């Protein structure tokens, strides 16, 4: 069966999500999920009907939250589908390329490689910012540039002046995609205000993180209407199931937004607690994080990761040497994780 698959697929290494990696324990801080399990109501009477391609209530609700026009919003099965749509819509297989800046989210390359689109990488600088000269030198045949801010796994914000420079150098050349999956934790750092000046800018959003709806798989692409209309040509006819649209709309209601903001305050306090506790440990560096996770460097990161794993505390090993990414959980989970790491190092 393997030999029947396309050559690109045969050579493909699948993205190792937290669930694929597995593990066994009672503290799960490896997927940047929210610890909050919120309840929603659902009307089961509509399940015999197909969903609308772009449910108006959901589109209007997210447009109001993001402070854009409804025609600037597209909803999809998570932000991952948004990534795939952008690559499929703007890149010719075996001709065009995407560009991204590791260390960063792994699905950009997977989405491109799956359909035979070349991937170009320009590593981030030592302080995890864009290497603009290297990016400019690599733009030949590049149709889509992906930038994650706050970046996963490093947690930092990409400098706004560098984003502006990138947008200027890619005018009439490529689409710039800002992955803002974690921007709800620092909305003042969003690039949504730049949509008015840059028609080649697209912004990815999700309800998986701050809204505590990772299992719902509901994401959004924000862009100018012309770009959104291109994506609507390639999206599936029923991308958002009826239950997803209904629950997501509830999450974006006045009451839902108030709950989300309260829970974000709780997570921010837990992040500060975890950061302060880890920083004082010997041989530990905690990088500033703007999302619901922290990147932590140890003298031997693999050893800490494995010891925690064996103890039922599931963290995320990082491709960055000796670094482990720790999602921010509830206070009990943070206390247990911090206590375990402290006992390992002292």
Swiss-Prot record:
UniProt signal peptide: none
Broadest EC class assigned to this enzyme: transferase
EC number annotated for this UniProt entry? 2.6.1.9
Gene Ontology molecular functions: histidinol-phosphate transaminase activity; pyridoxal phosphate binding
UniProt xrefs under HAMAP family: HisC_aminotrans_2
Give the record's subunit note: Homodimer.
According to its UniProt record, which protein family does this protein belong to? Belongs to the class-II pyridoxal-phosphate-dependent aminotransferase family. Histidinol-phosphate aminotransferase subfamily.
Under what name is this protein listed? Histidinol-phosphate aminotransferase
Q: Which organism is it from?
A: Aliivibrio fischeri (strain MJ11) (Vibrio fischeri)
Q: What is the lineage of its organism?
A: Bacteria, Pseudomonadati, Pseudomonadota, Gammaproteobacteria, Vibrionales
């Amino acid at each position: 069966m393997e030999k029947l698959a396309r050559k690109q697929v045969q050579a493909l290494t699948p993205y190792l999500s937290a669930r694929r990696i597995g593990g066994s324990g009672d503290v799960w801080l490896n997927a940047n999920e929210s610890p909050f399990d919120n309840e929603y109501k659902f009307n089961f009477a509509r399940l015999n009907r197909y969903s609308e391609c772009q449910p108006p209530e959901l589109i209007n609700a997210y447009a109001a939250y993001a402070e854009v026009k409804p025609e600037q919003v597209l909803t999809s099965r998570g932000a991952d589908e948004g990534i795939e749509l952008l690559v499929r819509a703007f890149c010719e297989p075996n001709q065009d390329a995407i560009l991204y800046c590791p260390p960063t989210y792994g699905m950009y390359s997977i989405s491109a490689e799956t359909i035979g689109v070349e991937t170009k990488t320009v590593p981030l600088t030592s302080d995890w910012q864009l290497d603009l000269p290297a990016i400019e030198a690599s733009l030949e045949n590049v149709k889509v540039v992906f930038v994650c801010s706050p970046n996963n796994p490093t947690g930092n914000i990409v400098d706004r002046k560098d984003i502006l420079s990138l947008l200027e150098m890619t005018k009439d050349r490529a689409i710039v995609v800002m992955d803002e999956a974690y921007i709800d934790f620092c909305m003042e750092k969003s690039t949504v205000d730049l949509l008015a000046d840059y028609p080649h800018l697209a912004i990815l959003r999700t309800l998986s993180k701050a809204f505590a709806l990772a299992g719902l798989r509901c994401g959004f692409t924000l862009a100018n209407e012309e770009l959104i209309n291109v994506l609507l040509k390639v999206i599936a006819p029923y991308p958002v199931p009826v239950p997803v649209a209904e629950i997501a709309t509830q999450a974006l209601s006045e009451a839902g937004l108030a709950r989300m903001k309260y829970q974000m305050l709780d997570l921010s306090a837990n992040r500060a607690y975890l950061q302060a506790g880890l920083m004082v440990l010997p041989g530990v560096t905690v990088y500033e994080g703007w999302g619901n996770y922290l990147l932590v460097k140890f003298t031997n990161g693999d050893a800490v990761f494995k010891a925690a794993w064996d103890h039922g505390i599931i963290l995320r090993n990082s491709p960055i040497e000796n670094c482990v990414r720790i999602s921010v959980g509830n206070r009990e989970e943070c206390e247990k994780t911090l206590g375990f790491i402290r006992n390992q190092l002292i």
